[in-house]
């Protein structure tokens, strides 16, 4: 009698059918799905598509994106609108699932609740937890050679990096910490001493000194004021009246022969 292992006609058992295979949606579930379709379009797809389309248009207009030779920014805008439509539909799936799970006597809502409670991939592992698990794996975990430790640099242990700097002689001339430089304030204070403050002078002292300087200025022969020359009055020239030579008549008239 042949064993079933040696029988070549043995076939693996068929897979279990999907729970939603040949599922008949109820009227309430169909109504909820239609509401989800409408709400996802107006609340998610339309804003996302409009935003991505405007970004594509202004990107081509400002030169950030390369437009089509014939159609310009139209292809980029259409692609942005289509991408925003699908992103909006995908982002509304969780809210639509919550609406279906709130329906009473819904087999689809019961399946969604069991999947959430039973540990689906999306519901059981959050992004933060998944990221933490990824960094704890072997390729990301630090090895002993990568971990920094200052034990090798401690003075108690003799290693090749322990440099005996304290026993070496130091030359004070080579130490430029206290060497004066152009930026040093001590050099400026040593070479440029401040002038002593002059005693204050009163108004009487200034007045007396001004008088002395004025008197010295007046006594100097080169500083005498300019004196205009005295105008000489000229006497009027008297015309000498020459008496005509000759005899006079009885009336005083003179004549010559």
UniProtKB/Swiss-Prot annotation:
Signal peptide: none annotated. Residues 156-170 have a biased composition (Polar residues). InterPro entries: OCAD1/2, OCIA_dom. Expressed in all cells of the primary lymph gland lobe. Residues 204-216 have a biased composition (Basic and acidic residues). One of its GO terms (biological process) is embryonic hemopoiesis. It holds the Pfam family OCIA. Residues 1-110 form the OCIA domain. It comes from the Eukaryota. Keywords: Endosome. It is found in: Endosome. GO terms for cellular component: early endosome; endosome; Golgi apparatus; lysosome; membrane; mitochondrion; recycling endosome. Residues 1-20, 148-257 are annotated as: Disordered. Marker for all hemocyte lineages during development. Belongs to the OCIAD1 family. Interacts with STAT3 and ARF1. This is OCIA domain-containing protein 1.
């Amino acid at each position: 009698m042949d064993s079933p292992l040696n029988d070549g006609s043995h076939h693996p058992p068929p897979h279990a059918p999907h729970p939603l295979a040949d599922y008949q949606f109820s009227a309430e579930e169909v109504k909820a799905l239609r509401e989800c379709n409408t709400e996802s379009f107006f609340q998610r797809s339309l804003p996302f598509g409009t935003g991505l389309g405007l970004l594509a248009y202004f990107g081509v207009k400002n030169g950030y994106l390369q437009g089509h030779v014939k159609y310009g920014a139209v292809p980029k805008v259409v692609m942005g609108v289509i991408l925003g439509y699908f992103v909006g539909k995908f982002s509304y799936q969780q809210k639509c699932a919550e609406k279906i799970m709130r329906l009473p006597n819904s087999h689809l809502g019961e399946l969604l609740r069991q999947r959430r409670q039973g540990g689906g991939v999306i519901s059981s592992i959050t992004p933060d937890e998944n990221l933490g698990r990824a960094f704890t794996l072997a390729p990301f975990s630090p090895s002993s050679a990568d971990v920094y430790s200052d034990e090798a640099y401690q003075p108690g242990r003799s290693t090749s990096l322990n440099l005996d700097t304290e026993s070496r002689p130091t030359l004070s001339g080579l130490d430029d910490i206290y060497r004066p430089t152009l930026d040093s304030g001590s050099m400026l204070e040593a070479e440029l001493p401040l002038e002593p403050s002059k005693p204050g002078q009163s108004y009487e002292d200034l007045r007396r000194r001004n008088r002395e300087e004025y008197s010295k200025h007046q006594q100097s022969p080169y500083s005498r004021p300019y004196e205009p020359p005295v105008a000489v009055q000229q006497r009027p020239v008297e015309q000498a009246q020459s008496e005509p030579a000759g005899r006079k008549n009885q009336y005083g008239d003179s004549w010559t022969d």
